[in-house]
Amino acid sequence: MKVSKERLATIGKFIGVYREEKRGKTQNKYTLKSFCNGICSVNTLKNIESGGLSRSNDVYVELLLKFDLKFGEFTIIDDALHILMKTLYEAIEVFDYELIKATIIKINKLLIKVKDFVFYAELYQIMSELYEYYINDKNFSDQEIQHFLNIFDHMERIYKDALRLLIFSKLRVSYVTNIEEYIERMEKIKVEEADHFCVRFAKLHYFLITEKYHSMSNLLVEMETYYESTNNYVRLLDVYNFAFILYSYIDTEYIEVYIEKVKKLTKIHVLPDIKISEIYSNIASSYHNRAEYANALHYYTQSLLFYRGDLVRQGILIADCQNRLGKEIDIPYVEDEEFQEYPLSIKLMYKYFCLAKEVPAFVRQTYIMKKLLPHLTDEVCIDIFQYELSKLVEKTNNYKMLYEFDREVRKHTS
């Protein structure tokens, strides 16, 4: 079968990725020497994995068999995919749920015929995961995201924004547990090189987490102007989401301005429930940051009326508001399957607020100091459990714990 030089280079790089992933699982048969034994020389394998070309396609065929993959290129399918990808990105840009769903189904109907072939197997997986993300709100595992990162540089440009969206869907949730890893991974996917405007939301998030507020403000203005000019009200709501977060840090007077913008937008236009839920959640966060806990609790609750997403994180924030208002802790129940998708630190925080009322204060203190403290790096989470600990030591008189808590936090955040 004839395969273009460009695709051969990509296939070779994929072979390198797959071999390294297998070798990382301590499978000795995937070392350079063992892997190519009887097929080609070590130098030839190194050349192939770096994107160089072999003189014989048979080498690729035999190497791919080790991963149960076939060798080939189908230009007719590629051309059809490029057309459908354009439609998919347009649907994502306006968050047209039904068109996203229908387009991915069409794409995978094409790909299912060739999903046993190298490159197409990756596309089939990417599209399947994209479907799960947009249609079923899937949370991805670290292993899945790491694989997407491993193949990112080797994918054709037209598919990179799809990968960026998948990778960012995980990073926006997991950043609180490892900010350094978040920054490294965000820099890896080069959001500034994205071809589609909606991917810039990842850049807004990056500016927020790295506290580059001036850059974030400039990008916000640019995106608000663009989406107003294109009458894309769903994405305009997304811009407002980030505006609430930004201005809660730098200029709280602007928050009320954006609340009025949201009210006007949601009154005039029919918008997806998930987007209204997100905007209410971020209004709640802006009030939370200003210690206006009653308003925050109101909007967190309103958010869940429209869409029950990210229940674990939302539950922690709701519990904090209830705690500070002197209310009984009453947070959303999370199914086990969904719960297991979250990082350990977030699960431990949620479990804390699920402790029975009868659990003694000294047991709660120990839980915070032993189980939670090693994972606390995010300012919001630190503040939540610093407050909780201060309440507990009033009962136990163990004020030394507050000093130890502050000392350990400084170690984590210095």
Model features per residue range: what roles?
Residues 17, 31-34, 58, 62:
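Alpha-helical residues within helix-turn-helix
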Residues 81-135:
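Helix-turn-helix/homeodomain-like alpha-helical modules used for DNA recognition
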Residues 23-47:
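Short alpha-helical DNA-recognition segment
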Residues 19, 48-49, 59, 67:
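DNA major-groove recognition helix of helix-turn-helix
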Residues 56-74:
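DNA major-groove recognition helix of helix-turn-helix/homeodomain DNA-binding modules
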Residues 125-411:
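Extended amphipathic alpha-helical coiled-coil/heptad-repeat regions
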Residues 2-6, 71-83, 376:
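TPR-adjacent "capping" and linker segments in tetratricopeptide-repeat scaffold/adaptor proteins
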